[in-house]
Curated annotation (Swiss-Prot):
Pathway: Mycotoxin biosynthesis. This is Diels-Alderase pyiF. GO terms for molecular function: isomerase activity. Diels-Alderase; part of the gene cluster that mediates the biosynthesis of the mycotoxin pyrichalasin H, a tyrosine-derived cytochalasan that inhibits the growth of rice seedlings, but also inhibits lymphocyte capping and actin polymerization and alters cell morphology. Pyrichalasin H is indicated as the responsible agent for the genus-specific pathogenicity of M.grisea toward crabgrass. The first step in the pathway is catalyzed by the O-methyltransferase pyiA which methylates free tyrosine to generate the precursor O-methyltyrosine. The gene is pyiF. Belongs to the Diels-Alderase family. SUPFAM superfamilies: AttH-like. Disruption phenotype: Abolishes the production of pyrichalasin H, and leads to the accumulation of sereval compounds that appear to arise from a redox shunt pathway from 1,5-dihydropyrrolone. Residues 1-17 form the signal peptide. It is an enzyme of class 5 (isomerase). Its EC number is 5.5.1.-. It holds the Pfam family DA_N. Glycans are attached at N60, N92, N219.
Length: 423
């Protein structure tokens, strides 16, 4: 067990003359003793209570604000400190980062995925470096998708947690998130002409680093493939979605989750492809991520972690069978009813989690039910996400049913839009 740490925060960037127009205050129950699901986890203590005082670290940047010249921006490799706090400060011309939130309805037919970006590499798709992507999939198999480019992004880390605001006052929209210090709850607020509402995700698992360690862990790594970093503040939990889209109320409960990505260079410089499965069924929460490098041939980093009633019962980064070490094999499945328009007509996944030393063997099946999002990037490849049903458990014991979200991304080998920015 790590000792408690007290972080004395200094102001990273001076805010504008007026305080950020936060959509809502810090939740009052975050101040209550013993309100965390995992009370022994490290919670960051600032000099003052949350607010605009010197006890909070503030990162406040405008749409085209970056470090000048060939400035090297370093960031931590280990899973200590806040996973939510910005990693690239200041933003430079090659790197980027993202706060991602997603959800699937309890019938597996509806979904959302939101991305809050600080990333100059997406300027090719719009104006400026501060992107917000909003995706919804509906039960009638239609989808809603919008992309916004903010004038300003403010991320504030205080004793109670971290909150972010992407805003364009001239256009009259703002999107925000709040995540508590123990990363057990996230609140996302949407406010534009077309989409308004509030989403709450409550975790059923501990935050994860890229090597499968739970946060905080002094030696846990956030490194996946070279120059690309990942953590999962909320592997999975319950979600309450209450949103109005173009006047239509969208309200459902189900499974939600939250990821953090940051990289030294663009995604398409570092990465050839990724695969992911997030599932919640019965007492289980399952997290799987796999990244394949674009810089080093045949290099893949995989992480699989399984929680049972909030406790880790399996973890491994080994993707091939072993007689001695814990391993997980993940196989795409085909022939199901739901697939996308990309060349790969995958309709689900099968995951085998095996611990030879503990005599444990878990099997999980994921079957796509609806397309959540899809990006066509050329050459028949791109990115896609599916809301899905899941079933499985320990072999020979009780089997459970639930929902899942799957994601896959492959970049084209030759495209003028996706050029390496490695230096």
């Amino acid at each position: 067990m790590l000792p408690s740490f007290i972080f004395v925060y200094s102001l990273l960037a001076t805010a504008t003359a007026t305080s950020p127009d936060w959509p809502e205050p810090w939740p009052s129950h975050w101040r209550e003793p013993g309100s965390d699901l995992f009370p022994n986890q490290q919670v960051h203590l600032a000099v003052e209570e949350a607010g605009t005082g010197s006890g909070c670290r503030i990162s406040n940047i405008t749409s085209n604000e970056m470090a000048k010249g060939r400035t090297i921006v370093d960031f931590p490799l280990y899973a200590v400190g806040s996973l939510e706090e910005p990693k690239l400060q200041p933003l430079n011309s090659s790197g980027g980062e993202q706060w991602e939130f997603d959800g699937v309805s309890e019938d597996g037919m509806q979904s959302f995925i939101f991305g809050f970006y600080r990333d100059p590499n997406y300027a090719i798709l719009g104006t400026g470096n501060l992107r917000v992507s909003i995706e919804f999939g509906f039960e009638d198999r239609t989808r809603f998708s919008e992309v916004y480019y903010a004038q300003r992004s403010v991320v504030e880390t205080c004793s109670l947690g971290t909150r972010g605001l992407w805003v364009d006052k001239e256009a009259g929209w703002k999107f925000s998130f709040l995540v508590d210090a123990a990363m057990q709850e996230a609140i996302i607020t949407l406010d534009s002409d077309t989409v308004k509402g509030r989403i709450i995700i409550t975790s059923r698992a501990k935050p994860l680093a890229a090597d499968g360690s739970t946060w905080p862990a002094e030696n846990a790594s956030t490194v996946t493939i070279p120059y690309y970093y990942w953590s999962q503040p909320i592997p999975a939990g319950t979600v309450e979605t209450n949103v109005e889209i173009k006047g239509k109320l969208i309200k459902w409960k189900g499974m939600g989750g939250h990821e953090r990505f940051w990289s030294s260079f663009s995604w398409f410089t570092c990465m050839r492809s990724l695969q992911a499965v997030r599932a919640m069924l019965g007492p289980y929460v399952l997290s799987y991520f796999s990244f394949t490098s674009n810089l080093i041939p045949d290099l893949t980093h995989q992480s699989v972690v399984l929680f049972h009633d909030g406790a880790v019962v399996f973890r491994s980064t080994l993707g091939t069978p072993s007689e001695t070490e814990d391993y997980a094999t993940v196989t795409k499945t085909y022939g199901g009813a739901t697939t996308g328009t990309l060349k790969d007509k995958v309709t689900g996944f099968q995951l085998e989690l095996v611990s030879p030393s503990k005599m444990r063997h878990y099997t999980f099946f994921v079957e796509h039910l609806n397309v959540g999002f899809e990006y066509i990037l050329g050459e028949g490849v791109g990115g896609s996400g599916f809301s899905s049903q899941s079933r499985g458990g320990h072999v020979g014991l009780d089997q459970h049913e639930g929902v899942a979200l799957t994601e896959a991304l492959t970049f084209p080998k030759n495209s003028p839009l996706f050029r390496s920015n490695y230096v």
